Structure formats: C-alpha cells, structure tokens
C-alpha cells in the first residue's frame, strides 16, 4: 500500500488542537495524540468546574453573611436574616450582602436593624 500524505484538512485540525494546547508542557505540547487527549480532558474539567464555581461562590457568600450576622448578633443566624429579607421583599442577593459584610460591616448592621424594626 502506498503512503497517502494527508492534506490541509488534517493539518488544520491538528494546528487548531495545538493552539488550545499552547500553554501545556512537555509531551502534552508536542505529540499530537497526547495533545488531543489533554485538550479533551481540559475541556471536561473546565465544563465541570464552571458549575462547581457557582456552587463554591454561593457557599462562600453564605459563610461571610453568616459570620457577619453572628458578630453583630442582630439575628441568630444567616437563615433568619434571609427569611426576614424575603418577608420584607427586599431585593438584595447573597453576593451583594457578602460584599457589604466584608467591605463595610456597619452597613449590614443597619440593614438588619431596619428589617428588625419593620417586624
């Protein structure tokens, strides 16, 4: 059987994969088969971790809000603060509350006091 040299289509496919693997090291950068395996693995990891990142940030925000509410002792816990926020129909998401809790805890204290006064 004669050798068939591959055309530009295969080369284009490999260079596309190579461009994804430009920051890899060693054989993961040089060998075509390793490049395809590692690029697939990287895409799987990035897809999985995009969902995980959302969960992790939400958990971090909840932890920060809970710590701030326990320090000021306005509400016993995070869950009571969130419950009262929903009851009063205040539109503050967890990300905003966590940012307030970290940057200026006194503002979180005043927000929670207002909620408690309205009760």
Swiss-Prot record:
The keyword Membrane does not apply. GO terms for cellular component: chloroplast; ribonucleoprotein complex; ribosome. Gene3D superfamilies: 6.10.160.10, Ribosomal protein L20. The keyword rRNA-binding applies. GO terms for biological process: ribosomal large subunit assembly; translation. It is found in: Plastid, Chloroplast. Its main location: plastid. Keywords: Chloroplast, Plastid, Ribonucleoprotein, Ribosomal protein, RNA-binding, rRNA-binding. GO terms for molecular function: rRNA binding; structural constituent of ribosome. It holds the Pfam family Ribosomal_L20. Binds directly to 23S ribosomal RNA and is necessary for the in vitro assembly process of the 50S ribosomal subunit. It is not involved in the protein synthesizing functions of that subunit. Belongs to the bacterial ribosomal protein bL20 family. This is Large ribosomal subunit protein bL20c. It comes from Brachypodium distachyon.
